[in-house]
Curated annotation (Swiss-Prot):
Residues 2-260 form the NodB homology domain. It comes from Pseudomonas paraeruginosa (strain DSM 24068 / PA7) (Pseudomonas aeruginosa (strain PA7)). Keywords: Antibiotic resistance, Hydrolase, Lipid A biosynthesis, Lipid biosynthesis, Lipid metabolism, Lipopolysaccharide biosynthesis. GO terms for biological process: 4-amino-4-deoxy-alpha-L-arabinopyranosyl undecaprenyl phosphate biosynthetic process; lipid A biosynthetic process; lipopolysaccharide biosynthetic process; response to antibiotic. It catalyses: 4-deoxy-4-formamido-alpha-L-arabinopyranosyl di-trans,octa-cis-undecaprenyl phosphate + H2O = 4-amino-4-deoxy-alpha-L-arabinopyranosyl di-trans,octa-cis-undecaprenyl phosphate + formate. GO terms for cellular component: membrane. The lineage of its organism: Bacteria, Pseudomonadati, Pseudomonadota, Gammaproteobacteria, Pseudomonadales. Pfam families: Polysacc_deac_1. One of its GO terms (molecular function) is hydrolase activity, acting on carbon-nitrogen (but not peptide) bonds, in linear amides. The gene is arnD. This is Probable 4-deoxy-4-formamido-L-arabinose-phosphoundecaprenol deformylase ArnD. It is an enzyme of class 3 (hydrolase). Catalyzes the deformylation of 4-deoxy-4-formamido-L-arabinose-phosphoundecaprenol to 4-amino-4-deoxy-L-arabinose-phosphoundecaprenol. The modified arabinose is attached to lipid A and is required for resistance to polymyxin and cationic antimicrobial peptides. The keyword Zinc does not apply. Belongs to the polysaccharide deacetylase family. ArnD deformylase subfamily.
Amino acid sequence: MIQAGLRIDVDTFRGTRDGVPRLLDLLDEAGLKATFFFSVGPDNMGRHLWRLARPAFLWKMLRSRAASLYGWDILLAGTAWPGKPIGRELGPLMRRTQAAGHEVGLHAWDHHAWQTHAGVWSAQQLGEQIRRGSDCLADILGQPVRCSAAAGWRADGRVVEAKQPFGFRYNSDCRGRGAFRPRLADGSPGIPQVPVNLPTFDEVVGPGLPREAYNDFILERFAAGRDNVYTIHAEVEGLLLAPAFRELLRRAERRGIRFRPLGELLPDDPRSLPLAELVRGRLAGREGWLGVRQP
């Protein structure tokens, strides 16, 4: 049996409203549980369009055929009109996810703002964004938030420090191999991190890998004897690619791949996890910096 964590990022209003119910049905059909990370504040994701001026981001959008993949309502959200408040209007879907037995955590208050500004915000601004998101999601769920995942994997040592006071059991803020405890500025171990170590759809699909070949590509990358942490998006696998994701789940079962929530990948005693650094790095297929484990 190959153990794998399944992380579902929910970035937008439409992804929550339309993608999450579909994914809940698919996971129920497969008898699986996963971790859902919700964005709960305003949906301003359309404001990323200014990044088209950057060649790497423009190429990513063209390579993944973003307009057909996401839809124009997602690509324009929060541009000509105020972003819709996701948690306030769609909180019942977050409670439904929790009631179905899935792990639920915080992705962001404002996904666009975090992905754009996390690298330059002050410690106070970082903490305020985390607090707003955590308080909102806790009010929706009726219980404290126990885990989080930085939007766009935009995390570094400052983000690690900012999350320390919130009592999360773990965070999934970076890319890399194996769960670890990040080293804080004073040398002590921080809240455990569960990194993602498999590529996402939008990072690899393009001229060299057509959509139809993606399932073959990704399934070959799950391996026994290690943590496999895989991320999908409600805006992709919950919408246009839902049939392909359903087939991926079926094929994964035949290969002995068993998906579970990320929290179940942690040892009973987190003190057994190794210490490592969480630093800024680069990853093929992504525009800009992101958090990576080192070493």
